[in-house]
Structure formats: structure tokens, C-alpha cells
Amino acid sequence: MKKIIVLALALTLALLFSCGKQDTESPYKDYLLFVGTDQGANTIMKLNVHTGSISPLCQDPLCRHTADSGCHFFGAVTGTIYQYGGKLYFQRRYQSAAGVVSYVIGYDPEDQSEKSLYEITGGGGMGFSLGYFWRSYEDENGDKISLRVDLAAEKLETLDENYQRPIGQYGKQYFYPIYNLGGQYGEYLTHGFALGDSDGNISKKYAEDKIIQLVCTDSIEDDIVLFYCPKQRDDGKYDLEDQTLWACDLKTGEEWLVNDNIGDVYFLRDGDIIYFANWIDDPPVVGFDLNDNKERYNRTGGKIWRQNIRTGETELFLETGHCLEATSIDMIDDRLLFAYTDTDYDDYTEIENKHVGIWYDYKETRGWVIINPADGSFIDVVNTADIYSRR
């Protein structure tokens, strides 16, 4: 449930940050950028999607990637890397003499310069999308504050409390959710979606008869957008782990069912074909979650499927043998990247006949399966710079 809630939050906050095709103006066209460790410090790493090699984005082989080293990429926060307009943006957090500080950083690879665009104090929801850094939070008086940083203009803007934030872009128009449900997940689920101008003036509404959890505005091709609809249980509540996938032609308004059992996994789209790692029946137990008091499962089974969104035809594409992270997929330079996390089950302990993983002690290996969809060939890359694995 935690994973799907994160996806739902992405709907209300911005695009789904970790999935989708790379910025067409990116100077790093052959690389997946991620936060990893080098010289014992967190920094931005690059994975060559053709060779599988991993190296620091910093070009100094002796750099320690610390605040006093002059490194442009020190203190990068996992999951915050964003490419826009040929530049690189990320959040930086590190310990200073005054305490923990956090900034929005813009890096220009052309002249190898960086600039701090915004200092983050406190928490709240935040992230990059549509050429902006967005943030919503409550101040010390309990008032709700919404703001955005225009990355190109390097300008901070405070938003009106009634401002309707777009969730994606389609040509010169913007996508907006339609919130009117209330109740269970009322702030996450929408009653259809709409297109309008940058000021929120709506010009056309879609799928108003459907309850929608996620509109995939980062995967529009040939005027077709895909969206997720959670199934309704017998008790009337919506099941965010049991969803259907629909398509909508933005020109004609025509809708059709693509997949009636997509679960809660994301996909990568290449024309009329989508790739995903779907749930399986009778999934193997990964371990026992002491916090939720229930078993945890590997529901992906290491299998990648592909489906034609128009005909519905589905076929098994590849068996990887890994525990695939079905919500962490990228497409870079015509390569599909499925992330995985494999656990060493020998490090689990039996407690009352339950497999219990010792947090920060049992061994995990993370990596990627990088696929060439043209011929089905792939390479398997272990993340040697992973900041989480215990190997």
C-alpha cells in the first residue's frame, strides 16, 4: 500500500517523477543518472545504458564529493534528479555548522557551473515537473503555503491559495485533476480529468464517469493518454492495489479498456506497445513486515510482459529471475531499464515460524535489467554504487 500511495501523491503533486522517457534536450542521452556512493559519499552517478558501466558524474577521479571539495554533485538527494532545457536540477542536503541545510540546485553542463535556486526549510510536499520546482507546506502559523520556482527564469513565485496546479502538459494545454469525491482517498482519486490553459481555465473534460488514480501524462503518444482506475470492493471502498488501465484519445474523447488486471504496477510505453512487470498468482514470501504485522511478497515474479494498447494482445517478453521493482522504470536512448532488488533469504531469521528480515542487516543486491526492445537482447547490471545494499 505504501508504494501505491506514493504513486497517488505523484498525481496530486506532479508527474510521476521516476518513470518516463528522458528529456529530449538532455546532454546525458546515453545515461541513467541516479544518486549513489563514491569515495564513501553520496553523489550523482551515471549508468551507461549501452555498456552497463557505472561512474561518478563528477569528472575529478580524486574528488571526495563533500561540501568542502568543490564537487558540483555532493549531497544529492535520492529521487530528486530532474533534467530540463539541457540543464540538470536536483535537491542537495547536507550537514553544516548551522545544522542540516537543503537547497534546489541548477547545474549547467555546458560551462560546468551551478547555482542555488531555492533554500528549503521544513518539510511538505515538493518535487520537479513542467519546468518548475513545486512546494506546498504549512508555516509556523498553520497557514498553507504553495510556491514554485521557475527553473528557466530562476524566479520564485508564491501561488494563490485557489491556484489549480496542472499535472501534465499536452501541446500548449495542461492536464488538471477533477477533485470532487471526498471520503476514502478523496484527495488522491479524481472524477475524470480535464485540459485547460496555464491559468486553469478548463476547455474539455474526459472520463467523468470514471474514478481515476493516476493519469500518465508523461506517456502520451499519437494523442493517446493512459490512466489507472482502481476497482471498487464489495464494501464500496476503492482498492489501490487492484486497478484497471484505460486509454483515451484526446482528439475524439474515445475511451477503451487496455488491461483489466494491471494491479498497481507502472509501465513503459513505446508507441502502441507497453512493457510492465505484472503481478503473479501465489507470489513467494519475501519476509514478514513487523510494522504492518503481515507477510511481504514479491508480486512481480521477475517476468516482463508487453501488450498492444489497441488490440489488448499480451505476451511474455522476458524472464529475468530478479525481484523487479514494478514502479521504477526508465526509457533512455531506446533502452528499457527495469530496476530490481534481490534479497539473500539465507539472512532471514525464523521467529514464530515467520521469515523476519533484520533491517539494515540482511543482504540485498540492487541493479537493472537493461533491454533493447528491438531484438529482446539485454544486459544485467549490478548497482555497485548503491547506497542501500548490504552485500
Where are the predicted features?
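Residue position within the beta-strands of beta-propeller blades
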Residues: L33-G36, Y89-R92, F133-Y137, F175-P177, ...
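An edge-strand/N-cap motif at the start of beta-rich repeat modules
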Residues: G20-P56
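Surface-exposed loop/turn elements that mediate protein-protein interactions on large endomembrane-trafficking
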Residues: T43-H65, G99-E119, N141-E161, Q184-E208, ...
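C-terminal motif of bacterial Sec signal peptides marking the signal peptidase cleavage site
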Residues: L15-S18
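Repetitive helical segments and hydrophobic/amphipathic motifs
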Residues: L11-T12
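Loop/turn-rich, solvent-exposed surfaces of beta-rich toroidal or solenoidal domains
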Residues: N278-P283, D292
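Positively charged n-region of N-terminal signal peptides that target proteins for export
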Residues: M1-I4
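Repeated scaffold domains used in trafficking and secretory/extracellular systems
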Residues: Q22-E25, H65-Q83, I120-G131, E161-G171, ...
